[in-house]
Amino acid sequence: MSAPTDQPPRSEGAQTNSSERSSQQQEQPQQSQSQNVPAKLLQHFQTNRIDSALWALRLLVIFFTVSYVLPIFTSQQSAFSKVMLANAAISALRLHQRLPAFAFSREFLARLFAEDSCHYMMYSLIFFNIRPSLLVLIPVLLYSVLHASSYSLKLLDLIGQNSWWGARFIISIVEFQAANILKATAFCEIFIMPYAIVLAFMNHAGLMTPVIYYHYLVMRYSSRRNPYPRNAFAELRITFEALAARSPPAFAKIIRGGIGFVNRLAPQLQPAAAQE
């Protein structure tokens, strides 16, 4: 009689070894891919220096705004000034991207003042030396969150790791609420106008601050790329007209007088700007 053989255990051991080898082979590409992530990011940053600098500056805006709300590592005045400086640097880089070489001509100046980035740089210059206020920081913060999220998603796609699902989920929420974020920014810019007047009367800002900010609002209202300021003014007008219809005659007259005053201050849109 033949002795029993040990073939089944050997086959199980061979299968175990083969499965271990296959798992090791699968882990090797993942490890090499994770090791290539810093190199990919570094190459991307070197190739897209301006866009990467804009992304970093927007992250600084978010960080210093949080530092303003929670002044643990720095004072509120310092955090406020750094947000304004970072916003001015962002606007300067965007103007460098969008405008040709400087030329002292009427066409160049007209194109310069039509750019949204020029408006945001003017915004930083207006409020750089005033008393710090969270209301002034909100428009800068919302713009930075919106644009930094978009570029962060591009970096996550470049890395190609699914482990960052939490960041992708937050970015998807921001992009889904992009219209509401731009709308909230427009309303904040409008509400800052009476706030600037109050600051001037309380000697917390210069007397020319409301005047200069009015010209800023005029440029935002005439923006060709961002219709949200015009839409915000239209919504406020509808709201106050409805409020005047429900108010007593004396209050209704005051409200309608304010609506007429704001309408007279509104600029006349050019046909090209209205179409865009």
Curated annotation (Swiss-Prot):
Protein purpose: Member of the dosage-dependent hierarchy effective upon white gene expression.
Species assigned in the record: Drosophila melanogaster (Fruit fly)
Compartmental location: Membrane
Gene Ontology CC annotation, any one: endomembrane system
InterPro entries: PER33/POM33_regulator (IPR051645), TMEM33/Pom33 (IPR005344)
One BP term from GO: membrane organization
The keyword Transmembrane helix belongs to this UniProt entry's keyword annotation: yes
Identification of the protein by name: Krueppel homolog 2
Family: Belongs to the PER33/POM33 family.
Alphabetical UniProt keywords: Membrane, Phosphoprotein, Transmembrane, Transmembrane helix
